[in-house]
Design a protein with these regions (language model features):
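Conserved active-site and SAM-binding loop architecture
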Residues: 1-263
Length: 263
């Protein structure tokens, strides 16, 4: 099986396929974050990195059997700006043909969520030589309007999965797939909370000063004024995290520890 993973991150797709004992002939990855790339190559040294999704030509690759990816969600998330897929001039992008036309005309795009259309471009190009290509796309829960745009573009209805049932995060997600004809059940609740995953011993440099904490609170207030819901939430050990991040900019995962500052 030849696999192409877009927006690959640390290559969780390879972890899942390995757990399922699915043999991979070639695993192509489109990722631009150097830290994510380094982690992937450490865990899976045979991975073939092919760079920016916007420059990807499927004809340069071996025939693809499985396409997976989770395109950026910032402009779609209820916690974000909710501008959707649009240009910097706020022209909404409602189809792949429209996206390609705007791209050829030199328009610049708002944020990164528009990269969904690059996933669709690549899926469409693969379908030309492999109509039976298996695909899986993940994104955040979004407004009905944009979910309908995704459904129409990809040709299947999104499946709502409550990923918080299997993690210590509040993660409701939508998946689009033709694997198993899209018959994907909800996972069983594992009852995971922060106390189940946090380390007992934490180095002191991970604890925030009063000054740093005030700065983070002010940052969230400024985002709220801009109608952008992204910002830190303080949770305790009996909660689920808003989101658990590895690296990246900003601090969202704050946990209150008794007798200590926030971590």
């Amino acid at each position: 099986m030849n696999v192409l993973s877009l927006f690959d991150g640390m290559s969780c797709g390879q972890i899942a396929l390995k757990e399922l004992n699915i043999f991979i002939d070639t695993y192509y990855v489109s990722e631009i974050d150097r830290f994510a790339i380094a982690q992937t190559q450490l865990n899976f040294p045979n991975t073939i990195q092919i760079g920016d999704v916007r420059k990807l030509n499927v004809l340069d690759l071996q025939p693809i059997d499985l396409l997976i990816g989770g395109s950026p969600c910032t402009q779609l998330s209820f916690a974000g700006t909710r501008k959707g897929l649009c240009t910097k001039e706020n022209i909404e992008i409602l189809s792949l043909d429209q996206y390609i036309e705007l791209k050829e005309q030199g328009f610049e795009f708002e944020g990164q969520s528009y990269l969904f259309w690059e996933y669709m471009r690549i899926l469409t190009e693969i379908r030309e030589y492999n109509p039976n290509i298996l695909f899986l796309l993940e994104n955040v829960e979004m407004g009905k309007k944009w979910e309908s745009v995704f459904n129409k573009a990809i040709g299947t209805q999104g499946i709502h999965i409550n990923s918080s049932l299997v993690s210590a995060q509040s993660r409701k997600r939508i998946y689009w797939t033709n694997i198993n004809d899209g018959n994907i059940p909800q996972p069983k609740d594992k009852g995971l909370l922060l106390r189940d995953i946090l380390e007992d011993e934490v180095d002191k440099h991970f604890f925030l000063s009063e000054k740093a904490l005030k700065g983070i609170v002010l940052h969230k207030e400024r985002n709220k004024e801009k109608k952008n819901g992204f910002g830190a939430d303080i949770r305790n050990h009996s909660d689920k995290s808003q989101t658990i991040r590895v690296g990246g900019k900003g601090v969202y995962d704050l946990v209150s520890v008794p007798s200590r500052k926030v971590i």
